[in-house]
């Protein structure tokens, strides 16, 4: 019996898992555990070129078979029966060396993304805290300082978005172990003005509150970054938050779709972003998010060499007939576009 057949065998026990009960149905039996040696043999059986068994086994031990599945998926043969998906077998020319290089590229890409998002998050925190703080030191707690739709419309569960946001903030404060939080608890009873408590916010809290700002406040902050109004920046922050979460959890980033395509101003007013309008794929994949980061960093950190480091990283991508940066949304000669010069 081949390893592929062994892998599909059902466990001897057909008892339903006690912790994860499933409804009745015609389910495929769960796959069985394979040793690292069996995993290596299975990859070979499916046609993957492996230059060094020792190196491949070490990578499986270090990274895990299932974690690497997403990286070798594009190298598998496409189905020919009209059904979406791919076969288990690898395409001609697929190699474990390319998979390792792709994984390393994605790892470095995640680090670059987190570097950019840190700068952007800190800058937008200051924007929000400074603008709202002038209005009231507890503006984040006062519905009259925020948008009426954010504070008044129900989410469908009897609570407003503002209520949900406030509960998440309270939980973040309760779990915080920062010295400044302890200081405010002991000296001021725990209540913190916006310019203090905003340091507890994660990117998700920041993004959601920005969406809940009054239109005039959103626009004032957005215009600092060369955007016509706040709907664009709100959309960008949501896309950045998704990418930040993927990167922070060490998940595959390079060819993943963003759940919400970010809004881009018309090319008549923002020619530097015009090439994003030429192909929807560019905005759905990480390239579009990288363009948003570059645009914001030109204001936040104009002397930063982040874009040059991205260009250098792109040179390490294992391009071949099966793998291209186009799958991440990158157009040909992207580095020559006005945005990247």
Where are these regions (language model features)?
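Long, contiguous internal "core" modules enriched in hydrophobic/ aromatic residues
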Residues: 3-341
């Amino acid at each position: 019996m081949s390893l592929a057949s062994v892998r599909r065998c059902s466990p001897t026990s057909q008892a339903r898992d006690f912790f994860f009960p499933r409804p009745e149905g015609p389910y495929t039996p769960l796959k069985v555990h394979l040793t690292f040696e069996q995993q290596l043999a299975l990859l070979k059986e499916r046609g993957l070129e492996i230059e060094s068994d020792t190196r491949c086994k070490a990578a499986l031990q270090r990274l895990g078979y299932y974690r690497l599945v997403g990286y070798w998926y594009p190298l598998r043969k496409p189905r020919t029966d009209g059904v979406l998906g791919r076969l288990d077998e690898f395409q001609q020319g697929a190699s474990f060396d390319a998979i390792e290089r792709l994984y390393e590229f994605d790892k470095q890409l995640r680090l670059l993304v987190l570097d950019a998002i840190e700068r952007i998050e800190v800058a937008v925190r200051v924007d929000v805290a400074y603008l709202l703080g002038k209005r009231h030191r507890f503006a984040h707690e006062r519905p009259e300082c925020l948008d009426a739709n954010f504070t008044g419309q129900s989410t469908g569960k009897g609570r407003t978005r503002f209520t949900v946001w406030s509960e998440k903030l309270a939980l973040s404060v309760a779990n915080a172990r920062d010295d400044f939080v302890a200081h405010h608890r002991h000296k001021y009873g725990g209540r913190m003005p916006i310019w203090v408590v905003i340091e507890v916010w994660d990117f998700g809290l920041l993004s959601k509150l920005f969406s809940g700002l009054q239109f005039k406040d959103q626009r004032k902050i957005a215009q600092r970054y060369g955007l016509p109004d706040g709907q664009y920046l709100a959309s960008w922050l949501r896309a950045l938050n998704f990418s930040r979460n993927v990167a922070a959890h060490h998940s595959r980033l390079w060819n993943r779709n963003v759940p919400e395509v970010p809004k881009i101003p018309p090319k008549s007013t923002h020619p530097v972003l015009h090439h994003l309008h030429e192909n929807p794929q560019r905005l759905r994949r990480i390239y579009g998010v990288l363009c948003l980061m570059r645009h914001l960093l030109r204001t936040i950190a104009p002397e930063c060499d982040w874009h040059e480091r991205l260009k250098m990283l792109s040179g390490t991508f294992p391009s071949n007939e099966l793998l291209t940066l186009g799958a991440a949304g990158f157009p040909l000669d992207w580095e020559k576009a006005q945005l990247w010069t």
